[in-house]
Amino acid sequence: MKKINFLVLAILASLFLAACGSHAQPNTSPGTGWGTGVFSTNGERIYFTATSDSGTAITYTGGPASNGWMMGGGQLTCASCHGTDGKGGVHSMGMMQTMDAKDIRWSVLQPEFDAAKFKLAVTQGQDPDGTQLNSDMPRWNISDQDLADLITYLQTIP
């Protein structure tokens, strides 16, 4: 009798855990503090989650996470620094440190940046004039297609 009770309890616990599990839907992420979890384009997904439609995380080196600014193991995304509206601005990243993130709406970046110069900024931390961006800007390991999709998304932000 004890074996049957244990078996029934184990089955019920398994069903409960399965019901509580995540049920991913196409074109969604587990959700972030920046987005709703539903994205209309790959570029928008990248901006808010640093993950491409393929499910691949877009990694980086440097940036606020390397400086200890992203406390609690937060995931760094474009929106983390440049905001949901792309306007950037001065904000605190913990421990009395501030960051002045650039406005990256495409309408503001033009004519200083084109796609090639934007790629250098995103992947190598290089400004259009050849100087290095400060250490707050991560150096992203992003594919050419994902970068093109991100630029297309930035072009839609008013």
Q: Where would I find each of the regions flagged by the language model?
A:
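Detector for the c-type heme attachment site
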Residues: 48-52, 80-87, 123, 155-156
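Bacterial signal peptide processing site
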Residues: 21-23
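Short Fe-S-cluster ligation motifs
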Residues: 46-49, 53-54, 108-122, 129-131
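Electrostatic cytochrome c docking/interface patches
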Residues: 25-74
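C-terminal capping alpha-helices of c-type cytochrome domains
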Residues: 39-42, 115-128, 135-158
